[in-house]
Amino acid sequence: MPGVQREFTAELWRAAGDAAWVFARLPEDVSAEFRDLPRPPAGFGSVRVTVTLGGSRWSTSVFPEGSSAYVLPVRKAVRTAEGVDAGDVVRIGIETAG
């Protein structure tokens, strides 16, 4: 199966109403590549990915946000290790898992 491997810069943002969740929005061109992947349906239209932010690397999923973009949850342990939080602009590497 063809995959996606990209790097991009994004601002971290905190979900409204839930201070625990922090996300990065994938750029439209990267999101379009994820939307076009041939894959079996996953929960909530999610796509399994491996992510790099600074010296941290982890596996997670990206989720569609409306019809134009995917969002990436950035867990607290990663934000703490990298010294970043909502409002910071970060460089992210992302690739489809498996």
Give the residues covered by each predicted segment.
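Short alpha-helix capping/helix-loop boundary micro-motifs
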Residues: 36-37, 75-80
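Long, compositionally biased stretches
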Residues: 1-69, 86-89, 93-95
